[in-house]
């Protein structure tokens, strides 16, 4: 089953929530527990412990000049009737201390549970270590 419009609308919400730090919207987008994976490994995350961390994450990004994040494209791969995998391509804009604007392209992969009114993130995969990715792009 292809969920094109449902996925598009969901990720418009992900983009909005990320740019505005809308914790209520973020709360509605994640399962109560989800798996987070990055180059250092995987871990099960309790959503209620994750949400209080997000303002600190936003402060980190602001400290390196983050202006906005946009989703440039989505690639959906249905798994079955209940789950779909979505690779999201993000374009992040930063303003360096010099005033120069720069962009960083980052990807994330999500496994979404599709039952119910709105999808829920049950797994979030970051292929790069975030701090290293920022260093590699000259932002740290």
Please place each PLM-identified region on the residue numbering.
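Short, surface-exposed coil-to-beta transition loops
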Residues: 69-71, 87, 102-109
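Short, low-complexity N-terminal intrinsically disordered segments enriched in polar/charged residues
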Residues: 1-28, 32, 139-140
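Short beta-strand edge/turn micro-motifs at domain boundaries
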Residues: 103-138
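Structural motif
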Residues: 30, 79-80, 115
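Short beta-strand segments enriched in hydrophobic/aromatic residues
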Residues: 30, 90-92, 125-127
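Short, cysteine-centered beta-strand-loop-beta hairpins and adjacent loop/turn segments enriched
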Residues: 92-103
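A solvent-exposed, acidic/Ser-Thr-rich amphipathic alpha-helical stretch
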Residues: 5, 23-75, 88
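A short hydrophobic beta-strand element
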Residues: 81-92
């Amino acid at each position: 089953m292809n969920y094109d419009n449902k996925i598009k609308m969901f990720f418009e919400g992900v983009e909005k929530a990320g740019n505005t730090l809308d914790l209520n919207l973020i709360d509605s987008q994640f399962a109560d527990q989800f798996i987070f994976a990055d180059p250092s490994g995987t871990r099960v995350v309790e959503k209620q412990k994750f949400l209080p961390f997000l303002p600190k994450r936003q402060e980190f990004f602001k400290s390196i000049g983050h202006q906005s994040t946009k989703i440039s494209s989505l690639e959906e791969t249905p798994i079955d009737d209940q789950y779909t995998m979505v690779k999201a391509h993000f374009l992040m804009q930063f303003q360096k201390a010099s005033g120069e604007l720069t962009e960083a392209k980052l990807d994330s992969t999500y496994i979404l549970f599709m039952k119910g009114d709105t999808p829920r993130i049950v797994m979030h995969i970051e292929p790069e270590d975030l701090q290293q990715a920022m260093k590699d792009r000259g932002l740290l």
